Regions:
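Periplasm-facing N-terminal accessory domains of Gram-negative outer-membrane beta-barrel systems
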Residues: 17-130
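Membrane-embedded beta-strands of outer-membrane beta-barrel proteins
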Residues: 66, 169, 256, 297-299, ...
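Outer-membrane beta-barrel proteins
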Residues: 127, 253, 267, 276-282, ...
């Protein structure tokens, strides 16, 4: 009897927490009616992602209502068709845990059939009080410098009160933030010890930034939450892309990526490399001993066995290297406080993570998400044996 009671208690705890998890999914619901506001049953409703080939279809019920569950964060177009009525379209933006409600009024078809396109204005997510900013792949590509591997312009250029100082991203005055991939956390408790990027911006499809008033299940990093929807391959048809650049300070940010999809399966993978002679923020106007470089790989796989199940796998492995900038003038005011002119130190940061998600839809109001993950992180501060004064090495390794 005690074992049964304990089992029921554990099961209750598990199921009570189903709704308390970070996610990248929302749902879209709506109603279709004629000019007299009578519901139209059996109308075909198609949901299409604007930035990829991902789509779902359904039909309205006897009440003229339709529902799409487990819709990833992003921008979508909904098309409603029914014989004897004009085709109608609307666009909508889905945020995590949101549930926008759409209304379609179908006009009686004329002899020359037309398509009515309704452009929906951007509105606040009424399902949440959390201030949210959504940045998509096109925004990153069109923002100067935002697609560089070490750049945070995709955040600082779009999010109020976001800025970078002493090489750390700050939001609302603090740098304790959380990163999530597909709604799965990539934890790192070594606050301010890591400088390398969590993901190359070129691998991002959508980035949802939350900056306060979020649910407790997101953790205790109270200054900001960055929820990444990586590129899936639904935007590709077995195609590859090579991105190269070259700029000041012998800077280059290069990537080779490829992806493709079928009706139920999509894949995306990339390799990237970057370097620059201007890495970290220098203590003075002169840039000395400040090179950086990095390389890595990223992969994303999505499989939909049936309409009620989805499997998502994301993996990343990269290494970054930074020289620690110095002030070369031994007589400067800064060197009188702490002499750095004799230092030749560096920071090396290997990092890798794997996240897996199984999303099962029981009904429109109950979705189960199982998301195991593993994250390896290391920050190695490496001092030169010729340092003056002597600096010790610091090795910090974490497994999550």
């Amino acid at each position: 009897m005690r074992k049964l009671a304990l089992s029921l208690f554990v099961a209750g705890c598990l199921f009570s927490g189903l709704s308390l998890h970070a996610t990248i999914f929302g749902k879209i619901q709506g109603i279709v009616h004629d000019p007299q506001h009578r519901p139209i049953a059996g109308a075909a409703v198609k949901l299409e992602a604007i930035t990829s080939s991902w789509s779902q279809t359904t039909q309205t019920d006897d009440n003229g209502e339709f529902l799409f569950t487990s819709v990833p964060v992003g921008d979508y177009k909904i098309t409603v068709t029914q014989p004897k009525f004009d085709t109608t379209e609307q666009t909508v933006t889905v945020a995590s845990n949101s549930s926008p409600i759409l209304h379609f009024q179908l006009a009686i078809a004329s002899v020359n059939q037309t398509t009515i396109v309704v452009s929906q204005a951007d509105v606040a997510n009424v399902d949440s009080v959390t201030p949210t900013t959504l940045v998509n792949r096109a925004d990153i590509a069109q923002t100067p410098g935002a697609d560089r591997t070490n750049s945070l312009a995709m955040i600082t250029d779009y999010v109020p009160a976001a800025y970078v100082t002493h090489d750390m991203l700050h939001m609302r005055g603090g740098h304790q933030v959380d990163w999530l991939i597909d709604g799965v956390p990539v934890p790192n408790t070594n606050i301010a010890s890591n400088l390398g990027p969590v993901i190359d911006p070129k691998d991002i499809d959508y980035l949802e930034i939350q900056r306060g008033s979020y649910d407790a299940d997101y953790g205790d990093r109270t200054y900001g939450i960055f929820n990444i929807v990586p590129r899936s391959g639904f935007e590709r048809d077995n195609q590859a892309e090579l991105v190269t650049s070259f700029g000041n300070w012998y800077q280059t940010n290069d990537q080779l990526n490829f992806g493709g999809h079928t009706q139920r399966f999509a894949y995306y993978a990339s390799l990237n490399a970057n370097r620059s002679n201007y890495g970290l923020q220098a203590p003075i106007g002169q840039v000395v001993h400040d090179a950086e470089n990095g390389y890595g790989g990223f992969a994303s796989f999505t499989f939909n066995p049936d309409p009620k199940n989805q499997l998502r796998l994301v993996a990343s492995l990269r290494q970054d290297f930074y020289q620690i900038p110095i002030d070369p003038d031994p007589n400067s005011a800064g060197n009188q406080i702490f002499p750095s002119f004799g230092l030749r130190d560096s920071e090396r940061e290997p990092d890798g993570y794997v996240t897996f998600s199984w999303i099962h839809t029981f009904n429109p109001n109950l979705i189960l998400t199982v998301s195991p993950f593993y994250h390896y992180n290391k920050a190695s501060y490496e001092a030169s044996p010729n340092d003056v004064p002597v600096i010790t090495d610091v090795q910090q390794t974490a497994n999550y």
